[in-house]
Amino acid sequence: MNTTTRTFYLPRLEDTFSVFPDNGLNPHYAECRIQSQAWIDKYYKIVCGPKMRAYMDHCKFELITAYTYPYASSDGLRKTMDLANILWLYDEFTDTLSGKDATNAAAIVIRTLRERDFDDGSWICHMMRDFYAAHIEKFGPNVSRRFIDHFCQYVEGTGTEAKHREKDHVLDINAYIIMRRAASAVLTAFDLAEYCLGIDLPQYVHDDPAFISGYNAGLDLVFLDNDLFSYDMEQAKGHCTTNIITVVMKSKRIDLQSAFDFTAGYCESLTQQLIAAQISLASRTDPVFSNNAVKCLEAIANWVKGSDGWSFATERYFGKQNVIVKETRAVEMRKSFQDIAVLKE
């Protein structure tokens, strides 16, 4: 397995995702971003130094919601932005922790979401209490239940990932996908898609095989696409053991570029799986499936396409080279920790 290559080429997945409609950007982005930044900044000030705060501002985390929820109202978009800011901050914070400390942080989140009178005085607890009061209480009962379950799964998963990083443990492909599905933050983003559509799907829809097929295809596409973009940053941090590229290189015994190409091919298959699920559900006689469930899968497809588009609009992955990388697809791998802001700087 050749790992010495210092340049790799990203696939053009926007061509693959061109089968999904382009619904543009949400028109409420500018106003909602100001509101969401003002809210999350009080927690950034506690956790991040000025260099990291400047870096995260350049990443334009709120912009991803304008790409992925173009149909959302101002109220809905604000909810998605607050969630995005929580997820990015929590992800950066737990990346610096040991497996034990990440597990302890997860326990605080879980107790805060499940025990309404819990307050240990920590910034994590207060951030989640704020989000619950401002947003979760407004969700429908099914979306609310799933959101809390999914968020708890996500934070538990950060502890698991941290333990894998500590041990340099690389899963096989199937085990990796199962782990990511079970504990992906994208699950919570999909829950908010339901809310923004004004839909509260009954659980039997989420348990339907055709819906599961489309839902999982969209979920896999989002985190695999993200793995492609984040690989260079993660290898520079020493965190690439929990990235599909490392997983594929080890499992298939292939080189770096071949792993990118393999993953791109898998994404093409998943795209067709998502489309097939929409067609299947649209043929049902029950409007809960033929209308509401299809709308939710369309929103998931929008998430896939929008997330891919945002990844080149942000400086999150390639810094000031983002436009050049979009044009050339060439990524020159960074040396360890080069240009990576440290949390407390």
Swiss-Prot record:
Top EC group: lyase
One of the Pfam families matching this protein, by short name: Terpene_syn_C_2
UniProt-annotated binding residues for Mg(2+) 1: D91
Entry superkingdom: Eukaryota
Cofactor(s) listed: Mg(2+)
UniProt key word Ribosomal protein: no
Motif (DDXXD motif): 91-95
Annotated signal sequence range: none
Keyword Metal-binding in annotation: yes
Binding site for Mg(2+) 2: D91
Binding of (2E,6E)-farnesyl diphosphate, residues: R316, Y317
Biological function: Terpene cyclase that catalyzes the cyclization of farnesyl diphosphate (FPP) to beta-gurjunene.
Family: Belongs to the terpene synthase family.
Name the UniProt record assigns to this protein: Sesquiterpene synthase GALMADRAFT_104215
Native source species: Galerina marginata (strain CBS 339.88)
